[in-house]
Amino acid sequence: MARQLRQIKAHGGAFQQFCRCVVSRALPELVFSVLQEGHQGNKGLSAPQLLHRNHENGPANGISMRTYSSAILFLIATTMWAPKASAADEVAAEVNGRFKQATNRTFKAFNQQREQTWQQPFFFFQLADTQYGMFTGNKGFEKEAALAQQAVKHINRLRPRFVIVCGDLTQASPEQARYRAQVAQYHQDFSKVDPEIPLVCVCGNHDIGNRPTPKSIASYSENFGDDYFSFWVGGVCNVVLNSSVLKDPTGAPEVLAAQQKWLEQQLRSAKAAKARHILLFQHHPLFLTKENEPDQYFNIPLARRTPLLDQLKRADVRAVFAGHYHRNAYGRAGSMEMITTGPVGKPLGKDASGFRIVIVHKANIQHQYYGMDDVPKTIDLTKATQTVEPTQQ
């Protein structure tokens, strides 16, 4: 029997799955039948009565020593190994708990009722374009992983109120073969962010495709939650949009229509609740430097940009944060800032890989982009100065 148990244990995870099934279904019947074996006096007794009787009398109660020992050893084996969850189970639980908090168009980490009231100045990190696989054209992602891990260390050291990653989490799209491996690495790296620091993910064109469809959006949602949603932090209303359907809605016009209707409701609610600031986050910049600049790959087409800008201005949106450009850019539409942030991953300009730190004061916001090697040791929340517009690279 000892040799058999060693062989069973060597099969590891398969035996654990078997044991979970046995413990929940077969084991009670097995123990009951074993205890009844070989003795008429045991017939008709309940399981608790049988256990008590055999505890007192043991094998002398008419059960063979071999049968009795087998039952005990089997019970020990299932007790030792059945409760252990597999590594895959643990990863799945981590994904569902950490990376899918965007649900029902809100973000579960924040209590909206409590967070609608201004409390005190705070800061958050805005990241963009981790884009695992871009350095090598989807052949590997060692450089992206190293940069992401460096960013995570800065996050855990400085402890922002939250972290938001503005799209293109991976280079591969859901229909491509390397997508799952890149998502798994993203999950592995960003699961190291302290659990007390909420991690917000935003979809980009690489995450759902340049012409997104309901199917590609659903694939993204399986790994990262909703594609658009809102959440409140310390009196500030934060709105996350799916900018890929703004860029090209032809594959999912119904998604764009639903998002636009939802956005109008969110902006009205934020104004009615007297939000201290309204901030908007998406992957594509609405524009890079000028609100009426011509259409190009890195901005939203004027046909949808202009009415959206009018909508945001009417709602007194303070700033829009984006990525996609793989370098920094800055512009204004009236009093609203359009802030485009460089990449955690591969840069396409002079800006080094890095991220933006945003300080939120009661009257204004400050923000500064830092390369990975230039991140400050501390964040001073006492200085309420205006942000200096960055030079475009």
Language-model regions, residue ranges each:
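Boundary at the C-terminal end of the N-terminal hydrophobic targeting segment
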Residues: 82-88
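Active-site glycine-centered loops adjacent to acidic/histidine catalytic or metal-binding residues
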Residues: 129, 167-168, 204-205, 283, ...
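Short acidic, glycine-rich surface-loop motifs adjacent to enzyme active sites
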Residues: 165, 270-290
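Extended active-site neighborhood of metal-dependent phosphoesterases/phosphodiesterases
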Residues: 91-116, 174-276, 298, 303-319, ...
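N-terminal active-site segment of His-dependent metallophosphoesterases
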Residues: 88-179
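Cysteine-centered motifs
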Residues: 19-21
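Bacterial N-terminal signal peptides that target proteins for export
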Residues: 63-72
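Bacterial N-terminal signal peptides
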Residues: 71-80
